Amino acid sequence: MGRGAILKFIFSLVWLMAVASPAFAADGQANAGANDPRMNQLYAVGGEQTCLKCHNSPPVNLILQTPMAVKGDLHSPFGQQGCESCHGPSADHAAGKMTPDGKLILPPILFKKPLIEGYDVSPVDKRNEVCLSCHQAGLRMNWQGSEMQKAGVACADCHTSHAAKDPVLVKATQPDKCFTCHAQQRAESFEYSHHPIREGKVVCSDCHNPHGSPAADHLLKEFTVNETCYNCHAEKRGPMLWEHQPVRENCLNCHTPHGSNEAHLMKERMNFLCSSCHSDTSTRNGSGGAFGGRGSIPYHSATGNSAFNSALANPRQCLNCHSQIHGSNSPAGAFFFR
């Protein structure tokens, strides 16, 4: 192909693009208009501006201070159909139309119970469906079938979209939101030994994922209790040369997570907790038990139980010798000595 033929081909291609582009653009605009919900008569003319003519005071208009009101973001409600992105088509409501029995027509999706008598909040599944149409990845991927979902909890029961800062997403206010339902955990947070929740150093979502969890219990962020605890208590992870089996099985064998009146979040006084596995018999006569045949040592006399009774009298007596209770790399580690 000669130089002249190549130039002729390029000129023809440019001419076709110049002619076709306006036609394609016009067709695209026509299709966009047909698919634009604002052209649908079910949606309010003027969008969110129509809504804000009446709903112009807190807490409703506080949504204007949130990322949800960024019109330039096509992933935000205001970048799509505004208020109707979440509340559904509301042209009849905006026009003040009434039902046959004389009641004002409200938007199809109501996240909170209206102040007007005779109306109720929308069903949980309808409300959650709206939220999950955008928020379904990441921490929410296990929502379906989760404990919260099965209990009929709605996203709006915890979250507040019409607020500059959602209380459940702010560390200072998140626990109070959780404690409105979890009263037992709230009471435990005031006990002598507790995780620093009230001090603002730990929040519920540091350990739990309320949207669902792959773990069997407790809506944990990790697969097991221990893996969750090790996120902060990494020094207890191991592996150790000498392992303490109850520790490896589950931290909750000895500790309670939210609060305790015993030191170190222990489930009960340390000496009684130890003796629940290391009984008088097993520690004195070497018959096996928790020590696996290594119980007949000088401190736990086989001729009497005075030493054992002394241990029971002092809450921390066991740790005077067996201080490395989470595991040890010491040559004397079989008994978790110092």
Language-model features and meaning:
Residues 1-7:
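N-terminal secretory signal peptides that target proteins for export/translocation
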Residues 8-21:
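Bacterial N-terminal signal peptides
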Residues 22-338:
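Short sequence/structural segments immediately N-terminal
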